[in-house]
């Protein structure tokens, strides 16, 4: 009877998840199970039928070895058994926080906390543990922080690079002063300091100097320390948002009336001398964001109901209007990714549609091309699947929303120039709900699926030093499935995929891709096995790490994918209590042999047609890498560096974006947009109106092609002033003076009338976007929660987050 009830319960939960995920009022269960974008196709989005061409069907590394049987790896069980280390944390902690200190040091700090609210008070305790051997053994060092309860919301603040600096913030009790605990020796010892304020956020380090710290107070005052927290000085009041810029620059927004809720009336200021002096560089600010060498400001227009983006490439000294659509109160801008060459910007559509358009900037951040329409980006939770595949340049994955509400994964291999569905895994079985065999593809689960509470424990994973490797949860069919996903692996940067593991798993990349590890995700049942692969996920082996299974909660390995140690965290549930358990497995003795020169082979990235002279050319050049042979069981080592050989390619039309034009399907030729025929493309540059003469092509930022095809492009100075909303009106009228008072009066009146008329005309018709279709978008909220700097963040506190949704490539503005 209990079995029947369980089955019924599982079925009901599955149906509920389907309805919750799709947000559609009615449809059959079968159609809700998977979804596919069919009815609407972006101009830059290739269909699956387009990919059935010979140049896209080349057999890849994973498929070439598919016929090889997995050979048994002898003797590994006894080897790993001797290198498996278990530690029990015998306290009543309800949560655990982990932080790696330094690179290659093996130092791991673990903070356990236990809290019990009692009426208007709360009781809590913290314990601090330290490991010097990658988590194999731990020492209780709680006495070093005087048994103080640590505020877990501030986390463990680790200094940049290999500074060895650590800061813990104590809990404020009974109105007393706040204490911080500082370490300069990787947590071996701590010094206690009292703060002259109560912090509102985690203390942040200067990225280039770990002795310089900055933090908000609960009164929105900005405090700075130059001696690693020993002494503090208040450098500004009424601070709404603050960020570290390049070259020790501090950017902040403030409101003279002290209210940060009046968005659109803020001032943007910067300091080059750690707060001794501040310079106002913008007014009417809603918010601002940083990305690469760009500074973006979201400002209110004269109407007070819309916002637009201004951009600066000289740290706010001069500003230009970004050619992006304006947005209203209910919309937002979001920087998805940025570097010194370009920016991906998401512009939200009006209404609560959950979609928008991705635009790509030029190298000045001013002119934008439309990259992808119907990009899925929910406004409520700020969830987007936009992911930078760091193991291969130019590759990004995200999701689009079809008009019927279905979700589909798309990928670009040339930095947003063209998007396409993912290829069906060569060993994958297409879901029966696919309407046509040609519509069967792989769909990746990322942030959106996690936010919808699907059974997805991890987002896609890639590492810069594990060339071509990508691990992700996904499903094969017509669209994203709400059923439990499987783990898929790509060894060529996302061109081809194969199913590596059945069901959801936690996974990690070790030894620069020479070793993959995974643990089954099953919150309701204890586990005792860890799986590992030495051939990029083709074959997997199981190691029983314990005879007493644990309820598994997470996998931890040192950042950078160079370690050979991985820790499984979980808890054991006894009759009397629960306690945390850490199991660390050292795989170094498994890969006992150092890799030699003959263990590596040459691999051409982005290869699709070996007979083409441009095979592998992406963004103007091709790269050949030395990669570990699939059948080589050896140790890359911590000092392993990616070996690559770049070769410049001649320019082709694929090295250019459309501007005022669009690609015809199955063609790289730009065709002029019907609504732009007969119109000039105009934009504002450094306060003057420019006219862009182009045959429809704009070179992709960061493209290094030489010679070959070079479409004509010319900018003409129209000698007409563009007035930036970022400057005060009185600042723009102090430019001319004459000797005669009457002439001055007449000229000033004429100039004022002309200026006002010109401003209205240019803002409305030129820079506002009547003629300009490909424009850049405003940045969205929650930018910092995802890592990149955002413009229109609703939450103005950084909270100690790092940069980008690239591993951090995401920025939001509004």
Curated annotation (Swiss-Prot):
<keyword id="KW-0732">Signal</keyword>
<keyword id="KW-1003">Cell membrane</keyword>
<dbReference type="GO" id="GO:0005765">
    <property type="term" value="C:lysosomal membrane"/>
</dbReference>
<dbReference type="GO" id="GO:0006895">
    <property type="term" value="P:Golgi to endosome transport"/>
</dbReference>
<feature type="glycosylation site" description="N-linked (GlcNAc...) asparagine">
    <location>
        <position position="146"/>
    </location>
</feature>
<keyword id="KW-0256">Endoplasmic reticulum</keyword>
<dbReference type="GO" id="GO:0005829">
    <property type="term" value="C:cytosol"/>
</dbReference>
<feature type="repeat" description="BNR 6">
    <location>
        <begin position="359"/>
        <end position="370"/>
    </location>
</feature>
<feature type="disulfide bond">
    <location>
        <begin position="430"/>
        <end position="440"/>
    </location>
</feature>
<feature type="repeat" description="BNR 8">
    <location>
        <begin position="488"/>
        <end position="499"/>
    </location>
</feature>
<keyword id="KW-0967">Endosome</keyword>
<feature type="signal peptide">
    <location>
        <begin position="1"/>
        <end position="18"/>
    </location>
</feature>
<feature type="disulfide bond">
    <location>
        <begin position="240"/>
        <end position="260"/>
    </location>
</feature>
<feature type="glycosylation site" description="N-linked (GlcNAc...) asparagine">
    <location>
        <position position="388"/>
    </location>
</feature>
<keyword id="KW-0458">Lysosome</keyword>
<feature type="repeat" description="BNR 7">
    <location>
        <begin position="410"/>
        <end position="421"/>
    </location>
</feature>
<keyword id="KW-0472">Membrane</keyword>
<keyword id="KW-0449">Lipoprotein</keyword>
<feature type="repeat" description="BNR 2">
    <location>
        <begin position="181"/>
        <end position="192"/>
    </location>
</feature>
<keyword id="KW-0539">Nucleus</keyword>
<dbReference type="GO" id="GO:0010008">
    <property type="term" value="C:endosome membrane"/>
</dbReference>
<feature type="repeat" description="BNR 3">
    <location>
        <begin position="223"/>
        <end position="234"/>
    </location>
</feature>
<keyword id="KW-0564">Palmitate</keyword>
<dbReference type="GO" id="GO:0005789">
    <property type="term" value="C:endoplasmic reticulum membrane"/>
</dbReference>
<dbReference type="GO" id="GO:0005886">
    <property type="term" value="C:plasma membrane"/>
</dbReference>
<dbReference type="GO" id="GO:0006897">
    <property type="term" value="P:endocytosis"/>
</dbReference>
<dbReference type="GO" id="GO:0032580">
    <property type="term" value="C:Golgi cisterna membrane"/>
</dbReference>
<feature type="disulfide bond">
    <location>
        <begin position="651"/>
        <end position="705"/>
    </location>
</feature>
<feature type="disulfide bond">
    <location>
        <begin position="70"/>
        <end position="539"/>
    </location>
</feature>
<feature type="lipid moiety-binding region" description="S-palmitoyl cysteine">
    <location>
        <position position="767"/>
    </location>
</feature>
<feature type="disulfide bond">
    <location>
        <begin position="617"/>
        <end position="649"/>
    </location>
</feature>
<keyword id="KW-0813">Transport</keyword>
<feature type="repeat" description="BNR 4">
    <location>
        <begin position="269"/>
        <end position="280"/>
    </location>
</feature>
<comment type="similarity">
    <text>Belongs to the VPS10-related sortilin family. SORT1 subfamily.</text>
</comment>
<comment type="subunit">
    <text>Interacts with the cytosolic adapter proteins GGA1 and GGA2. Interacts with the heterotrimeric retromer cargo-selective complex (CSC), also described as vacuolar protein sorting subcomplex (VPS), formed by VPS26 (VPS26A or VPS26B), VPS29 and VPS35; which is involved in retrograde trafficking of the receptor from endosomes to the Golgi apparatus.</text>
</comment>
<dbReference type="InterPro" id="IPR031778">
    <property type="entry name" value="Sortilin_N"/>
</dbReference>
<feature type="glycosylation site" description="N-linked (GlcNAc...) asparagine">
    <location>
        <position position="666"/>
    </location>
</feature>
<dbReference type="GO" id="GO:0031965">
    <property type="term" value="C:nuclear membrane"/>
</dbReference>
<feature type="glycosylation site" description="N-linked (GlcNAc...) asparagine">
    <location>
        <position position="257"/>
    </location>
</feature>
<dbReference type="InterPro" id="IPR015943">
    <property type="entry name" value="WD40/YVTN_repeat-like_dom_sf"/>
</dbReference>
<feature type="glycosylation site" description="N-linked (GlcNAc...) asparagine">
    <location>
        <position position="82"/>
    </location>
</feature>
<feature type="glycosylation site" description="N-linked (GlcNAc...) asparagine">
    <location>
        <position position="544"/>
    </location>
</feature>
């Amino acid at each position: 009877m209990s079995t029947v009830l369980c089955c019924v319960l599982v079925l009901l939960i599955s149906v509920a998840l389907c309805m919750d995920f799709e947000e559609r009022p009615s449809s059959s269960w079968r159609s809700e199970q998977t979804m596919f974008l069919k009815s609407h196709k972006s101009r830059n989005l290739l269909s699956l039928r387009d990919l059935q061409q010979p140049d896209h069907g080349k057999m890849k590394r994973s498929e070439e070895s598919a016929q090889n049987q997995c050979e048994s790896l002898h003797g590994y069980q006894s080897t790993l058994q001797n290198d498996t280390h278990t530690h029990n944390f015998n306290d009543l902690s309800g949560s655990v926080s982990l932080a790696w200190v330094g690179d290659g040091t093996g130092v791991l700090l673990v903070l356990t906390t236990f809290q019990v609210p009692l009426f208007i008070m709360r009781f809590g305790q913290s314990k601090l543990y330290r490991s010097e051997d990658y988590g194999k053994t731990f020492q209780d060092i709680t006495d070093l922080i005087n048994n103080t309860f640590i505020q877990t919301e501030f986390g463990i603040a680790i200094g940049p690079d290999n500074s060895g600096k650590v800061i813990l913030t104590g809990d404020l009790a009974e109105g007393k002063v706040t204490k911080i605990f500082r370490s300069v020796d990787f947590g071996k010892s701590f010094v206690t300091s009292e703060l002259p304020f109560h912090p509102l956020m985690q203390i942040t380090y200067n990225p280039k100097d770990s002795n310089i710290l900055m933090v908000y107070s609960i009164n929105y005052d900005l405090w700075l320390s130059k001696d690693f927290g020993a002494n503090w000085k208040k450098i500004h009041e009424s601070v709404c948002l603050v960020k570290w810029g390049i070259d020790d620059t501090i950017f902040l927004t403030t409101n003279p009336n002290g209210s940060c809720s009046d968005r659109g009336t803020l001032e943007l200021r910067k300091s080059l001398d750690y707060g001794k002096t501040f310079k106002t560089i913008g007014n009417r600010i809603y918010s601002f964001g940083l990305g690469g060498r760009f500074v973006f400001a979201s400002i209110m227009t004269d109407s007070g109901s819309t916002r637009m983006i201004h951009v600066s490439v000289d740290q706010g000294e001069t500003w230009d209007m970004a050619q992006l659509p304006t947005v209203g109160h209910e919309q937002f801008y979001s920087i998805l990714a940025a570097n010194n060459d370009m920016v991906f910007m998401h512009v939200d559509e009006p209404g609560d549609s959950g979609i928008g358009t991705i635009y790509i900037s030029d190298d000045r951040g001013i002119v934008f091309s439309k990259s992808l329409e119907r990009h899925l980006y929910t406004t409520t939770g700020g969830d987007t699947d936009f992911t930078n595949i760091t193991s291969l340049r130019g590759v990004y994955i995200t999701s689009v929303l079809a008009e019927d509400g279905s979700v589909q994964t798309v990928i670009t291999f040339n930095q947003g120039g063209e998007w396409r569905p993912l290829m069906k895994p060569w060993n994958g079985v297409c879901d029966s709900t696919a309407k046509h065999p040609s519509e069967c593809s792989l769909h990746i689960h990322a942030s959106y699926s996690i936010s919808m509470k699907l059974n997805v424990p991890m987002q896609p994973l890639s590492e810069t030093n594990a060339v071509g490797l990508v691990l992700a949860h996904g499903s094969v069919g017509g669209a994203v499935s709400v059923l439990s996903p499987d783990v898929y692996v790509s060894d060529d940067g996302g061109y081809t995929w194969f199913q590596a593991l059945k069901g959801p798993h936690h996974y990690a990349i070790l030894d620069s891709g020479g070793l993959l590890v995974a643990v089954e995700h099953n919150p309701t049942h204890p586990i005792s096995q860890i799986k590992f692969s030495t051939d990029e996920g083709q074959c997997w082996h199981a190691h029983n790490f314990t005879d007493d299974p644990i309820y598994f909660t997470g996998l931890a390995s040192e950042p950078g994918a160079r370690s050979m140690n991985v820790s499984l965290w979980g808890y054991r549930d006894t009759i009397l209590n629960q306690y945390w358990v850490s199991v660390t497995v050292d795989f170094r003795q498994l890969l006992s042999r150092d890799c030699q020169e003959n263990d590596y082979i040459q691999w051409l990235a982005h290869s699709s047609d070996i007979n083409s002279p441009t095979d592998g050319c992406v963004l103007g050049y091709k790269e050949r890498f030395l990669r570990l042979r699939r059948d080589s069981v050896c140790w890359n080592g911590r000092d392993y560096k990616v070996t690559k050989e770049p070769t410049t390619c001649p320019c082709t039309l694929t090295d250019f974006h459309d501007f005022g034009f669009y690609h015809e399907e199955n063609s790289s030729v730009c065709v002029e947009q019907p609504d732009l025929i007969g119109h000039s493309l105009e934009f504002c540059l450094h306060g003057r109106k420019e006219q862009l003469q182009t045959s429809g092509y704009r070179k992709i930022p960061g493209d290094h092609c030489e010679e070959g095809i070079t479409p004509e492009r010319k900018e003409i100075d129209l000698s007409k002033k563009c007035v930036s909303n970022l400057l005060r009106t009185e600042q723009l009228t102090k430019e001319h003076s004459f000797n005669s008072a009457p002439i001055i009066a007449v000229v000033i009146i004429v100039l004022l009338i002309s200026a006002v008329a010109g401003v209205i005309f240019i803002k409305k018709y030129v820079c506002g976007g009547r003629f300009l279709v490909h424009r850049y978008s405003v940045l969205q909220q929650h930018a910092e929660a995802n890592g990149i700097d955002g413009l229109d963040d609703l939450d103005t506190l950084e909270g100690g987050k790092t940069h980008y949704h690239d591993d951090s490539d995401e920025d939001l503005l509004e």
